[in-house]
Amino acid sequence: MDINLDPSRDDLPLMANTSHLLVKHYVLDLDVDFGSRVLEGNIVLFFGDGNRCKKQSSSSQETFQMESEEAYILRTAEPCHVPKMDSNTFSPKMGHREFAVFGKSDQDAFDNDGNHDNKEHDSESSSSKYCCDTGNHGREDFLLVLDCCDLSVLKVEEVDVAAVPDLEKFTKAPNLTAAPEKRRCEIVRDLVALPADAWREQLDCYTRCSQAPGCGELLFDSDKWSLQIRKKGVPTAADFPHAIRIWYKTKPEGQSVTWTSDQDGRPCVYTMGSPINNRALFPCQEPPVAMSTWQATVRAAASFVVLMSGEKSAKPTPLREGYMSWHYYVTMPMPASTFTIAVGCWTEMKPKTSPLDDLTEHTLPLRPSDADFRYGNTCSHMEYPCRFQSASAATQNIIPYRVFAPVCLEGACREALLWLIPSCLSAAHSVLGTHPFSRLDILIVPTNFPSLGMASPHIIFLSQSTLTGTSHLCGTRLCHEIAHAWFGLAIGARDWTEEWLSEGFATHLEDIFWAEAQQLPPHEALEQQELRACLRWHRLQDELQNSPEGMQVLRPNKEKTGHVSASGASVVKNGLNPEKGFMQVHYLKGYFLLRFLARTLGEETYFPFLRKFVHLFHGQLILSQDFLQMLLESIPENKRFGLSVENIVGDWLECPGIPKALQEERKAKDCSPSRLVRQVGSEVAKWIRVNRRPGKRQRRKREAAFEKLSPDQIVLLLEWLLEQKTLSPQTLHRLQQTYHLQEQDAEVRHRWCELVIKHKYTKAYDQVKRFLQEDQAMGIYLYGELMVSEDARLQQLAHRCFELVKGHMDKASAQVVTEMLF
């Protein structure tokens, strides 16, 4: 694998050799320093046996590809001189200047190899740097490879778990005749294998072991994408230390976290869904198969709130004057990419209700659904304390929740968000059953957040753009992110290129949840869903016209989907393409596929199946064929309408462009549009007539003729009006007044800004400027529209807005805009 891939252009390498050792638990211990914009401290990793030692499922056996292991064995080299350090007195605050000095020629070679240690320390390095000689010096050492990028690793050491008292209560009797190294490995193997009902004791053991002293430094090196660790004289993964501690600090420019200011102008830092995931936050195993639990202690100034994707609502512990410590944990194994942290001066927004009605503290009882227990209480995932086995969790339609935001957004949160949460959570439960996670925090993130929302275990990030206009955009986006609790988190894609398994499901389910949350009658729900399908059809056509064919395929690896190397390493195709984050093909084609299946097989068949699928596959990683095969096998052959896994994969997942079945469906809809779509068409015709006859008398005559439209209808209206070659300033002014466009939600205002730019409506240029500054999650493409207008004033507006926001803009977004402007 080429470790020198261009990080701005190529595929994303997943370097960790998970087939040899698997991280089972992480313990993070970090300090937040807003002055230097770094997180600093240590992380302890507890390992279990890798995938090569485990029996693969039949699905895994079909897709697991073995390659040569030669690239993952390091020939033993003579280490550079390493002065001894007392690990018990090591402080994470120690800078590089407290480490050993070695010759400049060695440092130059280190940098050329891709080391990311700070460049200013030309004559210094970590105490555990070793000289790598590819020549054969005799024995081979096992090399542990972790995914890592833009971290300053200071020290790596083995943890002496054997020094922790009373572990024998939870582990097998120690073999006192065995070597100390072997005893330590045996203790960790026993610890990670404790049963689910001993999770509290296991968590306590992890905590105490993470605080044990070091018992020897390990040799390490790093390149652009990984951290490599070895212990001299240890040739196999089985004998490699199973508990290691890594002292490190992040870098201000690291892409896993964003250091910025919130809407009140106060400093904050948060994980923003980077293409490189969390590897610039902590050394980890990135491949999704590396599912682990974790716990984290984070210290920050007392004025800050620390939020994380943890199972309990952490209460801060006072430390020295002016500082607090926050502790979170999870017991459900998840990929490291799902770890989320946000630190800022957030304020909890509480609904104004009586204590009995306060749904943030109480949950409403619901009759247990027979559907949730038809399939039995046996789960198919690895053992952990699972909510799907709990009768009380099955009846909990509204899980406890909290909302955090800057103080200046309190009014907007109360008006647009707080009252929606119970109905959206309850709607999701009515469709899919047991909530996979026990609680939910919702955070309104800073303006530079690059999307409308992001879901992680126990926490959802929402853009402030969702709080504008009516509750419609906020409700649909909240439903989308809630859906990810099941599809994307509780059930994940085993191959990250199959993004549709997360986004397609969430997009399809958001409409179902939202209709249920509004308690719409079936015919109104159907009308609303047909309207949104029409909108998505327009967007999909635009996406496919403006994207390369290679990025239109939902299963780009085809028959190699799910394949990894012998070590467990792999590559995510287009994972680092900055434009990919702004594409919606996986959302839209995935949505239309699921909609097609639900309509073809019947919703009365599809949604009960989906509930069953969730019950059987939660806590696991899947491929497309796992879902499709179970779906079709649950339906008698004479009711499958000729569908097969092969033709669905071939027509929908492995071909670019628009599937034939979708073309035929949309052609039929064009001939017979739904009522809400017809209503929009009628209004468009009125506006076209107004635009042709702009006289004052005609305007007055038709003033009351325009019907009230929903936000989705207004979006469709504006999209159709964008197809008109010219619209007069008078028509645009009247449009704005009729629908109060500047007060609508961000989706509507985005289309309005497109009209303003296309027709150079100067009176609304300030609204475009405001949108680019306050709605960065949606404004990227407007920069392109401004530039292709070939209007000097509009191009100047684009440059001015970019200058104002680029210092705080998401890096991928800034890169795309830079390419548009320069």
Curated annotation (Swiss-Prot):
Keywords: Aminopeptidase, Hydrolase, Metal-binding, Metalloprotease, Nucleus, Protease, Zinc. SMART domains: Leuk-A4-hydro_C. Zn(2+) binds at residues 480, 484, 503. Its EC number is 3.4.11.-. The keyword Cytoplasm does not apply. Its main location: nucleus. One of its GO terms (cellular component) is nucleolus. Its cofactor is Zn(2+). GO terms for molecular function: metalloaminopeptidase activity; zinc ion binding. GO terms for biological process: proteolysis. Binds 1 zinc ion per subunit. A motif (Nucleolar localization signal) lies at residues 692-702. The record marks 587 as: Transition state stabilizer. Pfam families: Leuk-A4-hydro_C (PF09127), Peptidase_M1 (PF01433). It is found in: Nucleus, Nucleolus. InterPro entries: Aminopeptidase_N-like_N_sf, AOPep, ARM-type_fold, M1_LTA-4_hydro/amino_C_sf, Peptidase_M1_C, Peptidase_M1_dom, Peptidase_M4/M1_CTD_sf. The active site is at 481 (proton acceptor). Aminopeptidase which catalyzes the hydrolysis of amino acid residues from the N-terminus of peptide or protein substrates. PANTHER family: AMINOPEPTIDASE O. Belongs to the peptidase M1 family. This is Aminopeptidase O. It comes from Rattus norvegicus.
